[in-house]
């Protein structure tokens, strides 16, 4: 490889954000270089061996709809699949896959190595080359200068990474990997707003020392779900169960008696940890009334004896970890193979980014993943695909793109970050989206694949598959509208109908009944409806049964769209807007929202303040 050549895009970091960023840029046809400190760890699952979950599964489906890698890799590595919230409405149902770490890395590496326009090189990056307010390349650990027209940083927890086990601490990007100290210093020298965050991981346990008879077995779903719209159950490896156990009062006593040895409670750790994935120390303190906490006992893979005890993340001293682990049901003789630890790292205030994940200070420098204050593989991958795509679009001199809040959870994620920032690791939940009924897992392709095709992200295989699916849905919906269910059909459904039909109705109206599904319609031979795959019939049922609610949300979106279309000039000085409070002026001048709608999502910006902004725009004869 000629390392003196100019790359269009250099992606720094080969985790979940970096792999999606590199693949996205390369799919758009630009010459892309992925730099990683260790090629063998591309796509490494640094913490829990799982993909998806509430809110997170939605992100994975959206990445897949844009032809990303995560869902396909999860299908090839998933050793247990479940649909969470299966008994609830379609808006909050979410897919989760327990994954084999080794198989997942293998699947990601295979996709990277088979991608045209993408080169992989093993080198850590120590510095950025900045000239004339733009990044022109990177300097690697061994002194190589690699030139680029755009750079995407996806450096995870490696920036200034510090690992804590009890009162002992040492520099590290994660256990066994060095931190990026030089790059952290270089970025701090750019005067970007920086902070510290914390995350943690539990000790790993040898499964041969666990008594599973004391635990509740948790099998996967049957039939086995798939993640990718192009996936099939036949893609999955062997399926295995997980287990559930609980802490005991003895566990809690040991932890309480050793809180003075916890770096978090001793004040040694300055970074804020994830609210929704607290350490076991945090749980014991915050929920002091609880006598036990649930632990999910998850296999790390098919070819390893290591178990991931989800729910006991800790940074207590190793000897204390051994003590409290052995008070947990089934863990009485547990052998810890790796200690739990906490890690602190640098992140940069995401309010310093545009919605395209480019830094406002250096417009051809993009950030994605934990560097922006998020936590989770799925959140990182979602940012990665947007950052990599926009880096490529910028080079091609094409319009950059990010989905709106009403188009995708990816849009919710990015808008939350750039508008509100974050003081703790940000995790996606369905509750963060205003339009949950529109942003379901099942329709991510209908929402995003056509746009992905227009942008150049979506390849022929996915486009052909999607086009056939969409055509089947549309043609069947038309058939349902033009077909009639007659009163005499009551006889077919004596045991099913809550209330018999009083008059003939269109099949589309009949399907809206909660007790009726598409399979019932197939029983009426005179309708001549086609047999269809489950993912298509599910889509047809949801679109019809929730039509009223969906229409109402669409109307709300249209009302708010005028605010999204009311753009705020970047040069607008909010000190000139008569009537705004000093707090609002300060926030608007710092964040520089791009639209009236984004301004309204900033904490403290009231509807009255938005009205004053509108008046100012009209008086100044700025476009409204």
UniProtKB/Swiss-Prot annotation:
<dbReference type="GO" id="GO:0030488">
    <property type="term" value="P:tRNA methylation"/>
</dbReference>
<dbReference type="Pfam" id="PF13932">
    <property type="entry name" value="SAM_GIDA_C"/>
</dbReference>
<dbReference type="InterPro" id="IPR049312">
    <property type="entry name" value="GIDA_C_N"/>
</dbReference>
<feature type="binding site">
    <location>
        <position position="370"/>
    </location>
    <ligand>
        <name>FAD</name>
    </ligand>
</feature>
<dbReference type="InterPro" id="IPR020595">
    <property type="entry name" value="MnmG-rel_CS"/>
</dbReference>
<dbReference type="GO" id="GO:0050660">
    <property type="term" value="F:flavin adenine dinucleotide binding"/>
</dbReference>
<keyword id="KW-0274">FAD</keyword>
<dbReference type="InterPro" id="IPR044920">
    <property type="entry name" value="MnmG_C_subdom_sf"/>
</dbReference>
<comment type="similarity">
    <text>Belongs to the MnmG family.</text>
</comment>
<dbReference type="GO" id="GO:0005829">
    <property type="term" value="C:cytosol"/>
</dbReference>
<comment type="function">
    <text>NAD-binding protein involved in the addition of a carboxymethylaminomethyl (cmnm) group at the wobble position (U34) of certain tRNAs, forming tRNA-cmnm(5)s(2)U34.</text>
</comment>
<dbReference type="InterPro" id="IPR002218">
    <property type="entry name" value="MnmG-rel"/>
</dbReference>
<protein>
    <recommendedName>
        <fullName>tRNA uridine 5-carboxymethylaminomethyl modification enzyme MnmG</fullName>
    </recommendedName>
</protein>
<feature type="binding site">
    <location>
        <position position="125"/>
    </location>
    <ligand>
        <name>FAD</name>
    </ligand>
</feature>
<keyword id="KW-0819">tRNA processing</keyword>
<dbReference type="InterPro" id="IPR040131">
    <property type="entry name" value="MnmG_N"/>
</dbReference>
<keyword id="KW-0963">Cytoplasm</keyword>
<dbReference type="InterPro" id="IPR026904">
    <property type="entry name" value="MnmG_C"/>
</dbReference>
<feature type="binding site">
    <location>
        <begin position="273"/>
        <end position="287"/>
    </location>
    <ligand>
        <name>NAD(+)</name>
    </ligand>
</feature>
<dbReference type="InterPro" id="IPR004416">
    <property type="entry name" value="MnmG"/>
</dbReference>
<dbReference type="GO" id="GO:0002098">
    <property type="term" value="P:tRNA wobble uridine modification"/>
</dbReference>
<dbReference type="Pfam" id="PF01134">
    <property type="entry name" value="GIDA"/>
</dbReference>
<keyword id="KW-0520">NAD</keyword>
<keyword id="KW-0285">Flavoprotein</keyword>
<feature type="binding site">
    <location>
        <position position="180"/>
    </location>
    <ligand>
        <name>FAD</name>
    </ligand>
</feature>
<dbReference type="Pfam" id="PF21680">
    <property type="entry name" value="GIDA_C_1st"/>
</dbReference>
<feature type="binding site">
    <location>
        <begin position="13"/>
        <end position="18"/>
    </location>
    <ligand>
        <name>FAD</name>
    </ligand>
</feature>
<dbReference type="InterPro" id="IPR047001">
    <property type="entry name" value="MnmG_C_subdom"/>
</dbReference>
<dbReference type="InterPro" id="IPR036188">
    <property type="entry name" value="FAD/NAD-bd_sf"/>
</dbReference>
<comment type="subunit">
    <text>Homodimer. Heterotetramer of two MnmE and two MnmG subunits.</text>
</comment>
């Amino acid at each position: 490889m000629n390392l003196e050549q100019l790359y269009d895009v250099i992606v720094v970091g080969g985790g979940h954000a970096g792999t999606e960023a590199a693949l996205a840029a390369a799919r758009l046809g630009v010459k892309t270089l992925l730099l990683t400190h260790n090629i063998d760890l591309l796509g490494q699952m640094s913490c829990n061996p799982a993909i998806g979950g509430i809110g997170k599964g939605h992100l994975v489906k959206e990445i897949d709809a844009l032809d990303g890698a995560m869902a396909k890799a999860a299908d090839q590595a998933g050793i247990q699949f479940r649909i969470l919230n299966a008994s609830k409405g379609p808006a909050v149902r979410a897919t989760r896959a327990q994954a084999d770490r080794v198989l997942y890395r293998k699947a990601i590496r295979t996709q990277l190595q088979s991608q045209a326009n993408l080169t992989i090189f093993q080198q850590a990056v120590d510095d950025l080359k900045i000239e004339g307010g733009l990044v022109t390349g990177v300097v690697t650990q061994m002194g190589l200068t690699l030139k680029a027209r755009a750079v995407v940083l996806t450096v995870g927890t490696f920036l200034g990474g510090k690992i804590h086990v009890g009162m002992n601490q040492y520099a590290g990007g994660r256990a066994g990997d060095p931190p990026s100290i030089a790059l952290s210093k270089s970025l701090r020298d750019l005067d970007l707003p920086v902070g510290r965050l914390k995350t943690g991981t539990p000790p790993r346990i040898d499964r041969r020392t666990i008594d599973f008879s004391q635990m509740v077995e948790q099998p996967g779903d049957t039939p086995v779900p798939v993640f990718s719209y192009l996936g099939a159950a036949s893609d999955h490896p062997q399926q295995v169960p997980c287990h559930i156990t609980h802490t005991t009062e003895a566990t809690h006593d040991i932890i309480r008696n050793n809180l003075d040895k916890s770096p978090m409670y001793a004040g040694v750790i300055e970074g804020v940890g994830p609210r929704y994935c607290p350490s076991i120390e945090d749980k014991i303190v915050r929920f002091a009334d609880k006598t036990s906490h649930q632990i999910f006992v998850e296999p790390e893979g098919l070819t390893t004896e290591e178990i991931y005890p989800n729910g006991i993340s800790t940074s207590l001293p190793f000897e204390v970890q051994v003590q409290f682990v052995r008070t947990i049901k089934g863990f009485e003789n547990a052998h810890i193979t790796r200690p739990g630890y906490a890690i602190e790292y640098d992140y940069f205030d995401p309010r310093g980014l545009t919605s395209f994940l480019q830094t406002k200070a250096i417009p051809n420098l993009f950030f994605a993943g934990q560097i922006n204050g998020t936590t989770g593989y799925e959140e990182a991958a979602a940012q990665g695909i947007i950052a990599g795509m926009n880096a490529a679009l910028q080079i091609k001199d094409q319009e950059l793109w990010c989905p709106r809040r009403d188009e995708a959870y990816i849009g919710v994620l990015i808008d939350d970050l750039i508008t509100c920032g974050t003081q703790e690791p940000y995790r996606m939940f369905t509750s963060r989206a205003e339009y949950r009924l529109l942003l379901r897992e099942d329709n991510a392709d209908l929402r995003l694949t056509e746009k992905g095709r227009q942008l150049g992200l979506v390849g022929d295989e996915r486009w052909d598959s999607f086009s056939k699916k969409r055509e089947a849905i549309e043609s069947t919906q038309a058939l349902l509208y033009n077909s009639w269910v007659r009163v005499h059909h009551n006889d077919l459904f004596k045991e099913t109908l809550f209330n018999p039909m009083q008059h003939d109705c269109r099949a589309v109206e009949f399907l809206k009944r909660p007790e009726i599904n598409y399979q019932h319609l197939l029983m009426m031979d005179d309708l001549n409806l086609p047999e269809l795959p489950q993912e298509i019939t599910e889509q047809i049922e949801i679109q019809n049964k929730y039509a009223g609610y969906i229409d109402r949300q669409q109307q709300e979106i249209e009302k708010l769209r005028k605010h999204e279309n009311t753009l705020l000039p970047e040069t607008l000085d909010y000190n000139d807007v008569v009537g705004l409070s000093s707090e609002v002026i300060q926030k608007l001048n710092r964040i520089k929202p791009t639209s009236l709608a984004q301004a309204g999502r900033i904490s403290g910006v009231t509807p009255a303040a938005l009205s004053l902004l509108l008046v100012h725009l009209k008086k100044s004869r700025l476009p409204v």
